[in-house]
C-alpha cells in the first residue's frame, strides 16, 4: 500500500476514535482492563511479539487427509486454507486478502495471505491485549471498521486489516459491557452472536435466548429487549430497535443482495424426538415480523409450558426452508462471486454443524439453496458432505460459517477441527 494512503488511514483512525469518544456513552471498566488505555491510544504493556499458529506438521497433514472424504459436485475441490483453532464466524477484509475469525473462547484470529496464494501465510491473535469473552461475531462496515460482538458487548476496530500487527490496536465500544442484554440474563448457552451490516447501513445482531424452551415469565422481557430475536442499531450504538422476534437461536444471517431481504438460520427445540422439530431458514422482508418461537417451531407446536394450547399468533411468518431435525443450521452467505457455475449465482450456501440430540447423527455438511424469481426459496440440496462418518457416527469436522472470498472461492470454518477450508471450481 502506498505510504500516502497509510498516512491517510492513520489520520482517519484518530479522527474516528475522536468521534466515537463523543458519540459513545462512558462506561467504567474493571481496573485490569486495557480497553481504556487503547481508546486513548496508549500502550498496554502487552508483549508485542504475538505467537503464530503453525500451518504445517502432523495436524495440518491430518486435516488435509480428512478432506479427502468430503464429497462435492463435479468440478469442485476443497483444500485446507488455514489452521485456525476454534474457528467460527468469518469476516473477509474489504481491502486486503485477510480474514478475521471469531471464536466462542477468548480469541479473534487475524488470518493473513501475504502472497495472494491458495493458502494463508500467517495466523495469529488479533488484539491480544484485550480479553475477549465469546467473540463469536465478526463483520465489516462499508468504510473498513471491524465489528466484534461478544455475548454482551460490541467493539469497533478502525482499519483493523492495516493495523493488526501489534498487541495494541485502536478500539471503540459501540455497546459497552453489560448493555447488549441485561447482565442478569447473561448465559453460557446460545450466547454466540452473529452480525451483519444491512443495506440501510445499520448493524444487525442476533440474540439467542438461553433456554431449550423459554419460561413464560421471560416472554415480555425478551420481546422488549430482542433476546430470541434480531436487533439493529446505528453503527455508533444509537437508535437500537428490535428487528425480528420469535427466533430461538440464530447463528447465521445474510442479506440477499438483489432484494435486500434478511435471511437467517434458526436452531430449534431439543428433546421432542429424532425427526422433530425440523431446522429453519427464514426470510425477513420488513421490521417487526414474528417467526413463531416458542409457540411453534418449523410447523411443530411446542408442548413445554403449554405453548401448544395458546392460539398461534396471527402474524407468524413460516420458514422458507425446513431442514433435517437437529442438524444445527449455523452460518450462511449469499454467493456473490463469479467463479462458480451459473446454477450457484442466485442463491445462498449454509452450514450444518451436526446433531447431538439424535439417535442417528446428521449434518456436518454444506447446503445450497436456490431462489425463485420472486425471491423466495426454491430447492435446497447437499453441496458438500463427508465430515461425518455415517458408519461410526464420528465427526471429523463440524462446519460453522461460510463466506465468499474475493476470487469467488468459498471459505468454510470448522471449530471442531480448527480450520478454514477453501472450495474452488474448475471446469470438470
Would you name each region that the model predicts?
Residues 30-73, 192, 209-217, 225-228, ...:
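Beta-propeller domain segments
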Residues 80-85, 126-131, 175-187, 242-246, ...:
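Surface loop/turn motifs at the tips and blade-to-blade linkers of beta-strand repeat domains
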Residues 88, 109-144:
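Blade-loop segments of beta-propeller domains
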Residues 90, 138, 195, 250-253, ...:
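Hydrophobic core register within WD40 beta-propeller blades
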Residues 94-96, 140-143, 197-200, 256-259, ...:
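Residue-level detector of Asp-centered blade-edge/turn motifs that repeat once per structural unit
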Residues 98-102, 145-148, 202-206, 261-265, ...:
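Conserved beta-propeller blade signature
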Residues 122-139, 151-198:
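Asp-box/WD-like beta-propeller blade repeats and closely related beta-sheet repeat scaffolds
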Residues 403-428:
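Blade-level signature of beta-propeller repeat domains, shared across WD40, Kelch, NHL, RCC1
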Amino acid at each position: 500500500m502506498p505510504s500516502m494512503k497509510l498516512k491517510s488511514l492513520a489520520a482517519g483512525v484518530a479522527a474516528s476514535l475522536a468521534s466515537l469518544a463523543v458519540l459513545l456513552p462512558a462506561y467504567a471498566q474493571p481496573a485490569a482492563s486495557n480497553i481504556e488505555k487503547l481508546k486513548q491510544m496508549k500502550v498496554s504493556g502487552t508483549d508485542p511479539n504475538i505467537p503464530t499458529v503453525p500451518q504445517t506438521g502432523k495436524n495440518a497433514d491430518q486435516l488435509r487427509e480428512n478432506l479427502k472424504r468430503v464429497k462435492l459436485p463435479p468440478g469442485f475441490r476443497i483444500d485446507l486454507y488455514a489452521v485456525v483453532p476454534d474457528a467460527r464466524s468469518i469476516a473477509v477484509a474489504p481491502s486486503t486478502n485477510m480474514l478475521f475469525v471469531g471464536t466462542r473462547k477468548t480469541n479473534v484470529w487475524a488470518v493473513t495471505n501475504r502472497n495472494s496464494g491458495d493458502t494463508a501465510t500467517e495466523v495469529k491473535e488479533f488484539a491480544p491485549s484485550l480479553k475477549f469473552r465469546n467473540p463469536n461475531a465478526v463483520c465489516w462496515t462499508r468504510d473498513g471498521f471491524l465489528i466484534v460482538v461478544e455475548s454482551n458487548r460490541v467493539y469497533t476496530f478502525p482499519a483493523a486489516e492495516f493495523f493488526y500487527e501489534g498487541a495494541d490496536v485502536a478500539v471503540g465500544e459501540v455497546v459497552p459491557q453489560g448493555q447488549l442484554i441485561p447482565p442478569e440474563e447473561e448465559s453460557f448457552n446460545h450466547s454466540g452472536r452473529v452480525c451483519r451490516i444491512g443495506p440501510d447501513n445499520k448493524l444487525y445482531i442476533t440474540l439467542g435466548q438461553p433456554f431449550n424452551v423459554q419460561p413464560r415469565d421471560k416472554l415480555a422481557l425478551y420481546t422488549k429487549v430482542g433476546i430470541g430475536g434480531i436487533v439493529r442499531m446505528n453503527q455508533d450504538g444509537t437508535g437500537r430497535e428490535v428487528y425480528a422476534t420469535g427466533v430461538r437461536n440464530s447463528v447465521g444471517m445474510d442479506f440477499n443482495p438483489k432484494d435486500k431481504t434478511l435471511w437467517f438460520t434458526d436452531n430449534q427445540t431439543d428433546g421432542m424426538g429424532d425427526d422433530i422439530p425440523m431446522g429453519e431458514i427464514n426470510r425477513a422482508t420488513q421490521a417487526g415480523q414474528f417467526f413463531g418461537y416458542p409457540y411453534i417451531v418449523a410447523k411443530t407446536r411446542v408442548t413445554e409450558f403449554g405453548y401448544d394450547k395458546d392460539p398461534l399468533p396471527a402474524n407468524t411468518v413460516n420458514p422458507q426452508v425446513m431442514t433435517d431435525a437437529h442438524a444445527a443450521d449455523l452460518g450462511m452467505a449469499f454467493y456473490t462471486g463469479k467463479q462458480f457455475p451459473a446454477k450457484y449465482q442466485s442463491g445462498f450456501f449454509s452450514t450444518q454443524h451436526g446433531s447431538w440430540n439424535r439417535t442417528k447423527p446428521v449434518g456436518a455438511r454444506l447446503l445450497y439453496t436456490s431462489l425463485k424469481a420472486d425471491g423466495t426459496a426454491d430447492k435446497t440440496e447437499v453441496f458438500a458432505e463427508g465430515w461425518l462418518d455415517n458408519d461410526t457416527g464420528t465427526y471429523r469436522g463440524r462446519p460453522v460459517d461460510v463466506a465468499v472470498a474475493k476470487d469467488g472461492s468459498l471459505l468454510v470454518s470448522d471449530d471442531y477441527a480448527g480450520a478454514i477450508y477453501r472450495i474452488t471450481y474448475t471446469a470438470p
